[in-house]
Each structure stands twice: as C-alpha cells, then as structure tokens.
Curated annotation (Swiss-Prot):
Cited PANTHER family: GLUTAMINASE
Keyword Hydrolase found: yes
Assigned keywords, A-Z: Hydrolase
EC number: 3.5.1.2
Subunit structure: Homotetramer.
Annotated family: Belongs to the glutaminase family.
GO MF annotations in UniProt: glutaminase activity
Catalyzed reaction equations: L-glutamine + H2O = L-glutamate + NH4(+)
Listed name of the protein: Glutaminase
Transmembrane segments: none
Length: 302
C-alpha cells in the first residue's frame, strides 16, 4: 500500500498548476499550492501515508459531515423534517432553489443545508464550535486539532451569501436561532485545521458500521452510517457528485481547502489533499489520485 500511494502521488503531481487555490476566502488564498498528501486508514487500525499527509489544512465543507453526525446523534430522524437528502444539481451556495422550495434545503451538504444543521446544533449545545472541536478530536484521536480563528473571521467578514440563505430560511420558518450566532459557529467548524491522517482516522467509523476503532465508541448505528455514506455518494462533491461517482465510485466529501475524504465501506477511509481546485470547487489533483487508487485496488461501491 505504501509504495502504491507514493506511486500515485508521483503520477498525479504534474497536474499541480492546472487548478486554482480558493481565493474568495482571503485567508485561504495564501496557501502554498503545490502541497499533496494522502492517508489510508483501515478498519484493522493500520495507517498508510504518503506526501504531505501530516500537514494540517482548513477542512471547510468536510466539517458538514461532522455537524450532520452530531445532529443525528442527538435528534435522530427528526432533522429530516427541516431538510432533504436529495442531490441539488446546483452550486453549493445557490439561493434560487432554496427560494423555489420554500426554505427547505435539498441536502445537508449544500451551504443552506449545513446552516440548518448548525441551527439544530445551536439549539442543543451551549458552545457549538467547542463541542464540534472536541468531537473531531475524539474521532481523529488527535487532541491538538484546533480552529484557525483567522480563517473563521475571514469567512465571517465575507458572509453575505450565507447570511442571505439563513435569513431566507428564517422567512420560511426554518431557522430558529440568531442568524449571526449560527454563522459564527458554522465558520468556526469550517475553519478546523486537520491533516489527511486526522481526517482518514476521523472518518473511519463510516467505513466500520458506525464504530470508531481507536476510541472504542459506537458513533452511529450501522443504518445511520449507511445513510450518511449514501448522502455523501449523491451529494458530497457539490454539483460534481455524479462525476466523482463515475470516476471514483465511492462515497466522498470535499472542501474548498483542497481536502477530499472517501469511504470504502467495510474496509478503509481515505483522505487526499491538494489545495488547487477545479471549476466545481473540488481538488483537481485529489480527484485524480482517488480515481487511480480506486482503479488499482478495485475499490468501488458500484
């Protein structure tokens, strides 16, 4: 496995320079673009890494999975009264569909859906951002996971579109807490800094029927774990989820920090990171690396 991961990174490295680092969040615009790492974590506890797998980066929308897991953990099926689990086919920050569907987001991985989930968590936790940080520390086994407050503040200063979505949902009665407070919590979650190793370990429970191997916790039921993997497969890469399913064939979740996590149910969780994005906001080199890994090992849910 180690040799294969190194070989794949060497093969995809020439793609660096063809994408573009996220620049609509000023604090992310200065990320060194030629970094590349991958980590594979098995249900047997074995870890395989290559490249910059231990370098922390901003996880951004990957955090939406953790928020969803928290909400399901304390509220169960009730959350689906406020949002759906269908693909949107629209950009992740679209307002048009949200207006047309009367303030009920299509799924928890577009921004509007993630804001509803954060609103649900805001009603549950006294300090939602700290609760999230502590949760991912447990999942990853890394007590050093932190929030990059500079990134969180930068996102808050450029919050107009997310605020518009939240106020639009509030106008339809689907947002219950103070919008600015929820936005603060949301951006703090997005600004968590984790490495490929951290994320591969943190997603291990989704490859293991909801059981976290290194903490010994049953995070979700097997049924709930299957459901989250299904939503990741249909909606985890914004409006490029179909292309990812076609090329990689695994449940996945991306973030504009350049990370992509993928799950091989019953076997492995994987995280790849390369900061340059394609036009859909997903790591250009990261998708290719996962495609090659899936092809050469024969991993696919299809």
């Amino acid at each position: 496995m180690q040799a294969l991961l190194t070989e794949i990174l060497d093969e995809v490295r020439p793609l660096i320079g063809q994408g573009k680092v996220a620049d609509y969040i000023p604090a992310l615009a200065g990320v060194v673009p030629d970094q590349l790492g991958i980590a594979v974590y098995g249900n047997d506890g074995q870890l395989h890494v290559a490249g910059d797998a231990r370098t922390p980066f901003s996880i951004q929308s990957i955090s939406k999975v953790f928020s969803l897991v928290q909400a399901i953990g304390h509220s169960g099926e009730a959350i689906w009264q406020r949002l759906g689990h269908e693909p949107s086919g629209q950009p992740f920050n679209s307002l048009v569909q949200l207006e047309f569907e009367r303030g009920k987001p299509r799924n928890p991985f577009i921004n509007a859906g993630a804001l509803v989930i954060c609103d649900i968590n805001q009603s549950r936790y006294a300090a939602p951002a700290l609760s999230m940080r502590d949760f991912v520390r447990r999942l990853s086994g890394n007590p050093e996971v932190t929030v990059d407050n500079h990134v969180a503040e930068s996102e808050y200063q450029h919050r107009a579109r997310n605020a518009a979505a939240a106020y639009l949902m509030q106008s339809f009665g689907n947002f219950h807490n103070e919008v600015e407070a929820v936005l603060r919590s949301y951006f703090s979650c997005c600004a968590l800094r984790m490495s490929c190793v951290d994320l591969a370990r943190a997603f291990g429970f989704l490859a293991n029927q909801g059981f976290c191997q290194h903490s010994g916790e049953q995070i979700l039921s097997p049924r709930q774990s299957k459901q989250i993997n299904a939503i990741m497969a249909t909606s985890g890469l914004y409006d490029e989820a179909g292309n990812f399913a076609y090329r990689v064939g695994l449940p996945g979740k991306s973030g504009v920090g350049g990370g992509i996590v993928a799950v091989v149910p019953g076997q492995f969780s994987v995280c790849v990171w390369s900061p340059e994005l394609n036009a859909a906001g997903n790591s250009l080199t990261g998708i290719k690396a996962l495609e090659l890994l899936s092809e050469r090992i024969g991993w696919s849910v299809f």
